[in-house]
Amino acid sequence: MGYAMSRFETDVSVIFSSSSDSETSHDSLINKPVKNLDHEIAQLTRLRSAPHENLSRDLLVKRVLPLSTMKMLAGREANVSGRGRFSSADCCHVVSRHLPVNDPCVVDQMTSRVYLSQFSTDGSLFIAGFQGCHIRIYNVDKGWKVQNDIIAKCVRWTITDASLSPDQKFLAYASLTPIAHIVKFGSAATESHANVTDIHDGLDFSSNDDGGYSFGVFSIKFSTDGREIVAGTSDESICVYDLEADRLSLRISAHESDVNSVCFADESGHLIYSGSDDNLCKVWDRRCFNAKGKPAGILMGHLEGITFIDSRGDGRYFISNGKDQTIKLWDIRKMSSNAGGTIQSRNSEWDYRWMEYPQEARDLKHPSDLSGATYKGHSVLCTLIRCYFSPDYSTGQKYIYTGSHDANVYIYDLVTGDQVSTLQYHKATVRDCSWHPNYPMLVSSSFDGEIVKWEYRGNDEAPVQGNNQRLQR
């Protein structure tokens, strides 16, 4: 379950992702031949998360056997790799098998839905946005103490998105209005009321051409240098706000429907990815915008609207979650200059907000699908559910994980496409989830109002199974 047909047919080398009996074990992943995935990303993932080839060659009795941590430690002592130490890939090989799928613990609970939740870049802070106008910032290193409780300004329906600045001093948040806000949260006061204890500066994403039309901001992200914010709006636009100049520096009509997700492709800030309810993902190169603001390329393959986009951070690969109940992996080198192909018709009256996805549509394929891989098993209904690459530092980005309408969190193997674990605890839709950048810890947030922390069960306890049973609270 989980992996569908890809347009690539190159086989790649075996990736060692299993463990000894005393460690996490996923039998379905043990040296399974990899097919139908672009050789390059499979190889890049292997280089980031597989042990050194000398360790694999000298310490494995057979290639089908797992390479345990104990064997790797013995190999390090014997300097089998010739380096005298573990490489980052060796470390990832060990840590990435310790999936954060055990011992769910409720970090916080409120009476309103949780719409977003994310760790900071260094993992020391965690932010959660609630429908009831609260944005809470937790200090992870101090026992998840609430460091700031921000009451958002001018919220319409809910807080749609929020983003921490790279220096972790400012928080930008958005709602279904043209004006987002930015607030400095490093003050001594725990509770930050709008324009009372802290100033919530408005970031106006409207233009003089709007004619007073009101729209909402669905997605908002800081650039890596913290100088700009990119936003996707319900009036089909992508906007870039220059924080130093305090003005809107770019606004283009990007899609033919709501722009549900935007992000910078890498640290340079030159490339922007966008996903929309017009079923398309687009790539925008700010260095070569022409007068008409055309994208650098278009990636088609989804049969329904895109709910979220996450970049691998290399300016080449990204994933998207779609209302067609799939996650797709993209290589922007495969993008097209136009949206070609005809999508097979379905019931146009279907609405993902309150209807199940039509069974007859589940096997439909886009005739011009440019994606590198498709992952299935989770449910994308009711809200803009998010998906992500697992952290580079601890896993080598070898997994993809996502929330789901069925109240679970799903983890897929990037290369094999296998569904390696399903986290079951919540009672309602899991809209967002976040994997700690350094440790085997994952936090899920749900419409049941709960923020739940998952960790790896150490101490040589029972190995993690592919699917956890629902735990009694």
Curated annotation (Swiss-Prot):
<feature type="repeat" description="WD 1">
    <location>
        <begin position="212"/>
        <end position="242"/>
    </location>
</feature>
<feature type="repeat" description="WD 2">
    <location>
        <begin position="254"/>
        <end position="285"/>
    </location>
</feature>
<dbReference type="InterPro" id="IPR017399">
    <property type="entry name" value="DCAF11/LEC14B"/>
</dbReference>
<comment type="similarity">
    <text>Belongs to the WD repeat LEC14B family.</text>
</comment>
<dbReference type="InterPro" id="IPR051859">
    <property type="entry name" value="DCAF"/>
</dbReference>
<dbReference type="GO" id="GO:0043161">
    <property type="term" value="P:proteasome-mediated ubiquitin-dependent protein catabolic process"/>
</dbReference>
<feature type="repeat" description="WD 4">
    <location>
        <begin position="377"/>
        <end position="413"/>
    </location>
</feature>
<dbReference type="Pfam" id="PF00400">
    <property type="entry name" value="WD40"/>
</dbReference>
<dbReference type="GO" id="GO:0080008">
    <property type="term" value="C:Cul4-RING E3 ubiquitin ligase complex"/>
</dbReference>
<keyword id="KW-0677">Repeat</keyword>
<feature type="repeat" description="WD 3">
    <location>
        <begin position="301"/>
        <end position="331"/>
    </location>
</feature>
<dbReference type="InterPro" id="IPR015943">
    <property type="entry name" value="WD40/YVTN_repeat-like_dom_sf"/>
</dbReference>
<feature type="repeat" description="WD 5">
    <location>
        <begin position="425"/>
        <end position="455"/>
    </location>
</feature>
<dbReference type="InterPro" id="IPR001680">
    <property type="entry name" value="WD40_rpt"/>
</dbReference>
<protein>
    <recommendedName>
        <fullName>LEC14B protein</fullName>
    </recommendedName>
</protein>
<dbReference type="InterPro" id="IPR036322">
    <property type="entry name" value="WD40_repeat_dom_sf"/>
</dbReference>
<dbReference type="InterPro" id="IPR020472">
    <property type="entry name" value="G-protein_beta_WD-40_rep"/>
</dbReference>
<keyword id="KW-0853">WD repeat</keyword>
